[in-house]
């Protein structure tokens, strides 16, 4: 691994900030000051930042987070805090989300440092299903289930959505399971049906269900069974 990448991930800096710190003699490898961020390092090396020994994070980290409203799933956003505020560095710098939720959508987000694993979840060819609890502004109509099962043509698109499963819970709440990830898909599906989504909560990805014991903003590691369920 490059030294500047390691420093950025472990200290919580951008790559350019890490490079600047290295040039300013803030980093030592095995007791020697190093001023080049391109130096390759390994876990056998002792890396110091401002005289503090940094620890290596093992590869293969998998978590579920109960995302609250008001934060985004990107690593950096000028308008909203990100979900990575809930994780301490150096861990936060190594994770990415396997799929995203809008700023006003709550619920299950999966995070990992394993790119191949997350690709299996997000790639359209794997058809990983996601289930949402949807709260609507107007009462549910009888034709919604059939319309979702047949596919709905969204505004501005040429192809209808893939068949989706809709379970009516009461007059204003439904569970919707989709296998795509189009832009604002759930909201646009109900807009096409003449309704409006006023609450959206993802509680299931594949066969993994959001842990009910997690408060908003809390996370826990996935079990080995959960990790394997998502790539079976």
Curated annotation (Swiss-Prot):
EC number(s) given by UniProt: 5.4.99.19
PROSITE patterns according to UniProt: PSI_RSU, S4
GO BP terms, alphabetized: enzyme-directed rRNA pseudouridine synthesis
Pfam families the UniProt entry points to: PseudoU_synth_2, S4
Domain of life: Bacteria
Ranges of residues in domain S4 RNA-binding: 1-68
InterPro entries with a match to the protein in the record: PsdUridine_s_RsuA/RluB/E/F_cat, PsdUridine_synth_cat_dom_sf, PsdUridine_synth_RsuA/RluA, PsdUridine_synth_RsuA/RluB/E/F, PsdUridine_synth_RsuA/RluB_CS, RsuA_PseudoU_synthase, S4_RNA-bd, S4_RNA-bd_sf
Catalytic activity as recorded in UniProt: uridine(516) in 16S rRNA = pseudouridine(516) in 16S rRNA
Record-linked SMART domains: S4
GO cellular component annotations of the record: cytosol
GO molecular function: 16S rRNA pseudouridine(516) synthase activity; pseudouridine synthase activity; RNA binding
Keyword Transcription regulation assigned: no
Active site residues of this protein: 102
Keywords: Isomerase, RNA-binding, rRNA processing
Top-level EC class: isomerase
Protein function: Responsible for synthesis of pseudouridine from uracil-516 in 16S ribosomal RNA.
Family assignment from sequence similarity: Belongs to the pseudouridine synthase RsuA family.
Protein name, UniProt field: Ribosomal small subunit pseudouridine synthase A
Name of the coding gene: rsuA
């Amino acid at each position: 691994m490059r030294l500047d990448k390691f420093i950025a991930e472990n200290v919580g800096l951008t790559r350019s900030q890490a490079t600047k710190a290295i040039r300013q003699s803030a980093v030592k490898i095995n007791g020697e000051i190093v001023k080049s961020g391109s130096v390759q390092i390994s876990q056998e090396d002792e890396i110091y930042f401002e005289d503090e020994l940094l620890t290596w994070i093992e590869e293969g980290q998998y978590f579920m987070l109960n995302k609250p409203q008001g934060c985004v799933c990107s690593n950096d956003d000028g308008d909203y805090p990100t979900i990575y505020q809930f994780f301490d560095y150096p861990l936060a710098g190594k994770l990415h989300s396997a799929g995203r939720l809008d700023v006003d959508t709550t619920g299950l987000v999966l995070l990992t440092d394993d790119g191949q694993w997350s690709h299996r979840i997000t790639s359209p060819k794997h058809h990983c299903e996601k289930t949402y609890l949807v709260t609507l502004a107007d009462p549910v109509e009888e034709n919604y289930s059939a319309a979702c099962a047949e596919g709905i043509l969204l505004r501005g698109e040429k192809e209808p959505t893939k068949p989706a499963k809709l379970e009516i819970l009461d007059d204003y709440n439904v569970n919707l399971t989709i296998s795509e990830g189009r832009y604002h898909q759930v909201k646009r599906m109900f807009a096409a049906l003449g309704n409006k989504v006023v609450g959206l909560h993802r509680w299931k990805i594949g066969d993994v269900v959001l842990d009910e014991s997690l408060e908003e903003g809390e996370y826990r590691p996935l079990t080995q069974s959960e990790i394997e369920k998502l790539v079976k």
